[in-house]
Design a protein with these regions (language model features):
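Metal-dependent polysaccharide deacetylase catalytic core of the NodB/CE4 family, i.e.
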Residues: 103, 119-123
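N-terminal catalytic cores of peptidoglycan-degrading enzymes
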Residues: 1-108
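Conserved beta-strand segments that form the floor/walls of ligand-binding pockets within enzyme
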Residues: 79, 116-118
Length: 187
């Protein structure tokens, strides 16, 4: 799994371009990965709804919840589905609209310096082994492409928007992810 520096694309991901992104500030290095959880409708896995949501094509009449989120313009760089399928919506050099109002280590506007990775899931249902495996591979590929991303620079949405967001939730096993990532590389 590799990141193409010119395109900002991950070679292992299915590409579904989202219009919901803009340019990052030019002088800000990418040094953080934010892990999210998403399911549409809430608690339902599979189907076309996440792709449709991130591409502004969600049919508000398909489910009552979709009327509540109609008009939201959000995205993430990547989605890891329950079966491990990897989808990319925004090139990494672009600023995806995933973290919203956020702050980490005294810096606000986390979208400026982070990569957003959505996991298909909810806060209180265990994530799948395939998702942990693919997420670890993604983190290694991103760290190789963006050296400022260190092992301790992978956090949850809950860490950058406490009180506002809870994902990826208590069902996400951070220790399991750390084991898959292995020891930090010597620099």
């Amino acid at each position: 799994m590799n990141v193409d520096a010119a395109s900002g694309r991950l070679d292992a991901a299915r590409q579904v371009p989202s219009p919901n992104w803009d340019a990052r500030p030019g002088d800000v290095p990418i040094d953080l990965i934010i892990v999210h959880g998403i399911s549409l409708p809430p608690g339902v896995f599979g189907g076309p709804w996440i792709d449709a949501f991130f591409t502004n094509a969600l049919d508000a009449g398909a489910h009552p919840y979709f009327r509540e989120i109609k008009g939201l313009r959000v995205s993430a760089h990547l989605l890891v589905r329950r079966d491990g399928e990897l989808v990319q919506y925004v090139p990494f050099h672009g600023r995806a609209w995933h973290a919203g109002e956020s702050r980490y280590e005294g810096r606000s506007r986390c979208n400026d310096f982070s990569i957003g990775v959505e996991l298909e899931g909810v806060d209180d249902v265990a994530y799948e082994e395939a998702q942990y495996r693919v997420l670890a591979e993604v983190i290694h590929a991103l760290a190789a492409a963006y050296p400022a991303i260190a092992p301790d620079r992978v956090v949850g949405h809950c860490d950058v928007a406490p009180g506002r967001k809870s994902d990826p939730g208590p069902a996400f096993d951070w220790a399991r992810l750390r084991r898959l990532l292995g020891p930090p590389l010597a620099t």
